[in-house]
Amino acid sequence: MAQNNKELEKLAYEYQVLQAQAQILAQNLELLNLAKAEVQTVRETLENLKKIEEEKPEILVPIGAGSFLKGVIVDKNNAIVSVGSGYAVERSIDEAISFLEKRLKEYDEAIKKTQGALAELEKRIGEVARKAQEVQQKQSMTSFKVKK
Protein backbone atom coordinates (compact mmCIF):
# COMPACT_ATOMS: atom_id res chain seq x y z
CA MET A 1 0.00 0.00 0.00
CA ALA A 2 2.84 2.40 0.86
CA GLN A 3 4.50 1.48 -2.41
CA ASN A 4 1.32 2.42 -4.27
CA ASN A 5 1.26 5.79 -2.49
CA LYS A 6 4.87 6.46 -3.49
CA GLU A 7 4.11 5.47 -7.06
CA LEU A 8 1.07 7.76 -7.09
CA GLU A 9 3.16 10.65 -5.76
CA LYS A 10 5.78 10.02 -8.43
CA LEU A 11 3.11 9.92 -11.15
CA ALA A 12 1.45 13.08 -9.82
CA TYR A 13 4.79 14.90 -9.90
CA GLU A 14 5.54 13.67 -13.44
CA TYR A 15 2.04 14.72 -14.51
CA GLN A 16 2.57 18.25 -13.16
CA VAL A 17 5.97 18.57 -14.85
CA LEU A 18 4.55 17.38 -18.18
CA GLN A 19 1.58 19.76 -17.85
CA ALA A 20 3.95 22.69 -17.24
CA GLN A 21 6.03 21.72 -20.28
CA ALA A 22 2.89 21.43 -22.41
CA GLN A 23 1.74 24.86 -21.26
CA ILE A 24 5.09 26.38 -22.25
CA LEU A 25 4.95 24.70 -25.67
CA ALA A 26 1.37 25.93 -26.18
CA GLN A 27 2.49 29.48 -25.37
CA ASN A 28 5.42 29.16 -27.78
CA LEU A 29 3.05 27.90 -30.46
CA GLU A 30 0.80 30.91 -29.93
CA LEU A 31 3.76 33.29 -30.20
CA LEU A 32 4.96 31.57 -33.39
CA ASN A 33 1.49 31.89 -34.93
CA LEU A 34 1.29 35.58 -34.01
CA ALA A 35 4.74 36.29 -35.46
CA LYS A 36 3.86 34.38 -38.63
CA ALA A 37 0.63 36.38 -39.01
CA GLU A 38 2.58 39.62 -38.67
CA VAL A 39 5.06 38.57 -41.38
CA GLN A 40 2.16 37.53 -43.64
CA THR A 41 0.58 40.95 -43.19
CA VAL A 42 3.83 42.71 -44.09
CA ARG A 43 4.25 40.51 -47.18
CA GLU A 44 0.68 41.24 -48.31
CA THR A 45 1.20 44.97 -47.75
CA LEU A 46 4.34 44.94 -49.90
CA GLU A 47 2.56 42.95 -52.63
CA ASN A 48 -0.29 45.47 -52.61
CA LEU A 49 2.18 48.36 -52.72
CA LYS A 50 3.55 46.98 -56.01
CA LYS A 51 0.07 47.32 -57.54
CA ILE A 52 -0.27 51.03 -56.73
CA GLU A 53 0.45 53.22 -59.74
CA GLU A 54 0.96 56.53 -57.93
CA GLU A 55 4.62 57.47 -57.59
CA LYS A 56 4.26 58.77 -54.01
CA PRO A 57 1.09 57.29 -52.53
CA GLU A 58 -0.43 58.64 -49.33
CA ILE A 59 -0.63 56.37 -46.30
CA LEU A 60 -1.73 56.49 -42.68
CA VAL A 61 1.16 56.03 -40.25
CA PRO A 62 0.14 54.47 -36.93
CA ILE A 63 1.48 56.40 -33.93
CA GLY A 64 -0.20 54.35 -31.19
CA ALA A 65 -3.46 54.29 -29.23
CA GLY A 66 -5.47 53.99 -32.45
CA SER A 67 -4.09 57.29 -33.76
CA PHE A 68 -2.52 57.98 -37.15
CA LEU A 69 -0.67 60.63 -39.10
CA LYS A 70 -1.02 61.15 -42.83
CA GLY A 71 2.16 60.38 -44.68
CA VAL A 72 3.64 59.82 -48.12
CA ILE A 73 5.73 56.87 -49.26
CA VAL A 74 8.87 58.52 -50.64
CA ASP A 75 10.37 55.35 -52.19
CA LYS A 76 7.84 52.67 -53.08
CA ASN A 77 10.47 50.52 -54.81
CA ASN A 78 12.43 49.62 -51.67
CA ALA A 79 11.64 48.47 -48.15
CA ILE A 80 13.67 48.16 -44.98
CA VAL A 81 13.25 44.69 -43.47
CA SER A 82 14.43 43.30 -40.17
CA VAL A 83 17.01 40.55 -40.50
CA GLY A 84 17.07 39.80 -36.76
CA SER A 85 19.11 40.82 -33.73
CA GLY A 86 17.97 44.42 -34.11
CA TYR A 87 19.41 44.78 -37.63
CA ALA A 88 17.53 45.83 -40.75
CA VAL A 89 18.53 46.10 -44.40
CA GLU A 90 17.14 47.93 -47.38
CA ARG A 91 15.88 45.62 -50.12
CA SER A 92 13.89 45.99 -53.29
CA ILE A 93 10.22 45.19 -52.79
CA ASP A 94 10.62 41.87 -54.63
CA GLU A 95 13.69 40.92 -52.57
CA ALA A 96 11.86 41.89 -49.38
CA ILE A 97 8.87 39.73 -50.36
CA SER A 98 11.18 36.82 -51.15
CA PHE A 99 12.95 37.26 -47.80
CA LEU A 100 9.61 37.32 -45.98
CA GLU A 101 8.45 34.18 -47.79
CA LYS A 102 11.57 32.36 -46.56
CA ARG A 103 10.84 33.57 -43.05
CA LEU A 104 7.25 32.29 -43.37
CA LYS A 105 8.59 28.84 -44.32
CA GLU A 106 10.84 28.93 -41.24
CA TYR A 107 7.82 29.78 -39.09
CA ASP A 108 5.85 26.93 -40.68
CA GLU A 109 8.66 24.49 -39.85
CA ALA A 110 8.94 25.76 -36.27
CA ILE A 111 5.16 25.57 -35.83
CA LYS A 112 5.06 22.02 -37.19
CA LYS A 113 7.93 20.96 -34.91
CA THR A 114 6.30 22.58 -31.87
CA GLN A 115 2.94 20.97 -32.67
CA GLY A 116 4.66 17.58 -32.90
CA ALA A 117 6.42 18.06 -29.57
CA LEU A 118 3.15 19.18 -27.97
CA ALA A 119 1.32 16.13 -29.34
CA GLU A 120 4.02 13.85 -27.90
CA LEU A 121 3.75 15.57 -24.52
CA GLU A 122 -0.04 15.25 -24.54
CA LYS A 123 0.30 11.56 -25.37
CA ARG A 124 2.71 11.10 -22.44
CA ILE A 125 0.37 13.06 -20.14
CA GLY A 126 -2.44 10.67 -21.09
CA GLU A 127 -0.21 7.66 -20.38
CA VAL A 128 0.74 9.00 -16.95
CA ALA A 129 -2.92 9.73 -16.12
CA ARG A 130 -3.94 6.19 -17.15
CA LYS A 131 -1.11 4.69 -15.11
CA ALA A 132 -2.15 6.72 -12.05
CA GLN A 133 -5.74 5.58 -12.50
CA GLU A 134 -4.59 1.94 -12.67
CA VAL A 135 -2.57 2.34 -9.47
CA GLN A 136 -5.55 3.94 -7.72
CA GLN A 137 -7.85 1.13 -8.86
CA LYS A 138 -5.35 -1.47 -7.70
CA GLN A 139 -5.07 0.33 -4.37
CA SER A 140 -8.84 0.50 -3.89
CA MET A 141 -9.21 -3.18 -4.81
CA THR A 142 -6.52 -4.07 -2.27
CA SER A 143 -8.16 -2.02 0.48
CA PHE A 144 -11.55 -3.53 -0.41
CA LYS A 145 -10.14 -7.07 -0.04
CA VAL A 146 -8.51 -6.18 3.28
CA LYS A 147 -11.78 -4.79 4.72
CA LYS A 148 -13.70 -8.02 4.05
UniProtKB/Swiss-Prot annotation:
Q: Name one GO biological process term.
A: protein folding
Q: Which domain of life is it from?
A: Archaea
Which family is it part of? Belongs to the prefoldin subunit alpha family.
> Where does it localize?
Cytoplasm
What is the phylogenetic placement of the source species in the record?
Answer: Archaea, Methanobacteriati, Methanobacteriota, Thermococci, Thermococcales
State whether keyword Chaperone applies.
Answer: yes
Q: Per its record, how is this protein called by name?
A: Prefoldin subunit alpha
Role noted for this protein: Molecular chaperone capable of stabilizing a range of proteins. Seems to fulfill an ATP-independent, HSP70-like function in archaeal de novo protein folding.
Q: What InterPro entries has UniProt attached to this entry?
A: PFD_alpha_archaea, Prefoldin, Prefoldin_subunit_alpha
Q: What quaternary structure, including any partners, is listed in this protein's UniProt entry?
A: Heterohexamer of two alpha and four beta subunits.
Q: Return the GO cellular component terms, semicolon-separated.
A: cytoplasm; prefoldin complex
Question: What Gene Ontology molecular-function terms does this entry list?
Answer: unfolded protein binding
Species assigned in the record: Pyrococcus horikoshii (strain ATCC 700860 / DSM 12428 / JCM 9974 / NBRC 100139 / OT-3)
UniProtKB keywords: Chaperone, Cytoplasm
